[in-house]
């Protein structure tokens, strides 16, 4: 009997060791799906290769507490495609990779990650598509854990945008009345908030060791300085720091009235664009929060800066931004 027990124990121990030494299974690749119904997204531009359109988006849940990455592709004809998809967070947040294998079809398809908690300071997704055997430049979208605030008075867009900026960074946002006093909004002609007063007010609520805000004029009539200004906006967003911009509200696509004499602040919190071979990002769209009603909108970069912001400050050729 003892011999049988020893033999049984030997078998069981061998089985346990065998279980321990079995190699881990590789991560499962994603699968292509039909297009999902999306509600709130921040997306890269739609690019086209050989008649096949593609883009990547950050999709947020209804209360903007969770996010996932979605890669969309729309073939113009039967073709093969695949995608490598990545979702990551600034700071020490998680870094999630997924991929959908080669598929041949003429139907629209989407590859996406699972929803995960949205974290500060920012979230990024990037997708690299292989289409008809050729890898494309990666497309990217970045956004933040937005905490949009609605201005409490008709001329408090400045305090509302500053409050949105601080809350989105993760700082307990002070009352708009306090911000309006510090910005001297009520002491200015027409009750306006002057851009030069904004950086010091924002910086008074953040540590001196953190990125400090400043304001500047971008000379948009010069291609080189215009691109440099866009790069500085991208740099600030890539730090998880929103950017405020002065605009003529009636020229915004979501406004329904002409306001040639009014000025207004909106807050840029994200972008969508393409990643070039040298690693630089060229955005084609911005995601903005409008304090008029605490709404979010996507807008073409040139539409915002060239067709709108450049007319808001001195009437010609320069846009005013507040950024880190």
Task: Go through each PLM region and give its residues.
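Short, solvent-exposed, Trp/other aromatic-anchored flexible loops in extracytoplasmic proteins
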Residues: 98-140
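Active-site-adjacent substructure of cysteine-protease-like catalytic cores
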Residues: 225-289
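N-terminal prepro-regions of secreted/extracellular proteins
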Residues: 1-57
């Amino acid at each position: 009997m003892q011999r049988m027990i020893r033999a049984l124990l030997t078998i069981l121990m061998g089985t346990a060791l065998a279980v321990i030494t079995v190699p881990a299974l590789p991560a499962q690749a994603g699968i292509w799906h039909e297009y999902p119904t999306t509600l709130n997204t921040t997306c890269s531009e739609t690019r086209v290769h050989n008649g096949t359109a593609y883009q990547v988006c950050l999709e947020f849940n209804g209360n903007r507490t969770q996010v996932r990455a979605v890669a969309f592709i729309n073939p113009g004809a039967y073709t093969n495609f695949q995608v490598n998809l990545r979702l990551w967070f600034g700071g020490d947040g998680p870094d999630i990779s997924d991929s959908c294998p080669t598929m041949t079809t003429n139907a629209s398809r989407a590859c996406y990650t699972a929803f995960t908690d949205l974290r500060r300071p920012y979230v990024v997704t990037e997708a690299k598509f292989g289409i008809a055997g050729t890898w494309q430049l990666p497309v990217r979208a970045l956004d933040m854990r937005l905490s949009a605030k609605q201005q409490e008075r008709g001329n408090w867009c400045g305090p509302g945008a500053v409050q949105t900026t601080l809350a989105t960074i993760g700082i307990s946002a002070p009352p708009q009345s306090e911000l309006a006093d510090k910005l001297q909004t009520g002491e200015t002609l027409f009750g306006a908030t002057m851009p030069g007063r904004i950086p010091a007010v924002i910086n008074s609520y953040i540590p001196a060791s953190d990125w400090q805000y400043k304001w500047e004029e971008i000379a948009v009539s010069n291609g080189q300085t215009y691109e440099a200004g866009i790069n500085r906006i991208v740099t600030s967003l890539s730090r998880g720091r929103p950017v405020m911009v002065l605009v003529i509200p009636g020229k915004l696509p979501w406004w329904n009235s002409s306001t040639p004499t009014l000025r207004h602040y909106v807050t840029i919190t994200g972008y969508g664009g393409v990643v070039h071979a040298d690693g630089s990002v060229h955005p084609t769209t911005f995601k903005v929060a409008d304090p008029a009603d605490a709404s979010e909108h996507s807008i073409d970069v040139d539409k915002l800066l060239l067709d709108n912001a450049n007319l808001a400050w001195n009437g010609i050729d320069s846009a005013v931004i507040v950024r880190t």
